[in-house]
A protein has these predicted regions:
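Short, solvent-exposed recognition segments
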Residues: 1-70
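Cysteine/selenocysteine-centered motifs that mediate thiol-based redox chemistry or coordinate metal-sulfur cofactors
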Residues: 30, 36, 115-126
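Extended hydrophobic
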Residues: 47-120
Length: 126
């Protein structure tokens, strides 16, 4: 579970990685220089090279995944919301316990749901 207002590392969450994937490499480097890439679990990305590969995959796929990288046993999918200019508004993610999620089905069902909600959010905030 998470507490409202709790701060989390961007590289460990689906929403955070979705946001990082929208940023230029220089901004990602700046963030990593300030926060580092601390491991939260044994699945957390802790190297710049691995993070760069993950962000490239997110850009191609259109959504980010968290495979127990922030908390053991939690699987999440996240997408970013942007302004027409391309500026990041934020991100939305949906998470569930690993034991209750069939990963492929989880992704297939939730990407269209997230797409719809992201579209509504972007339309309302423009």
């Amino acid at each position: 579970y998470f507490t409202v207002g709790e701060r989390m590392y961007l590289h460990t969450t689906a929403a955070g990685k979705a946001i990082l994937a929208e940023y230029p490499e220089e901004r990602v480097d700046f963030i990593v220089d300030r926060t580092g890439l601390p491991g939260q679990t044994d699945r957390t990305i802790t190297s710049r090279e691995a993070l760069k590969r993950e962000l490239d995959e997110i850009r191609q796929r259109g959504y980010a995944l968290n495979r127990g990288e922030d908390q053991e046993g939690v699987y999440a999918i996240g997408q970013v919301a942007t302004k027409p200019s391309g500026a990041v508004l934020g991100a939305i993610s949906v998470a569930g316990p690993t034991y209750r999620t069939k990963k492929r089905r989880f992704e297939e069902r939730l990407t269209s749901t997230l797409d719809g909600h992201i579209g509504k959010l972007e339309a309302r905030l423009q």
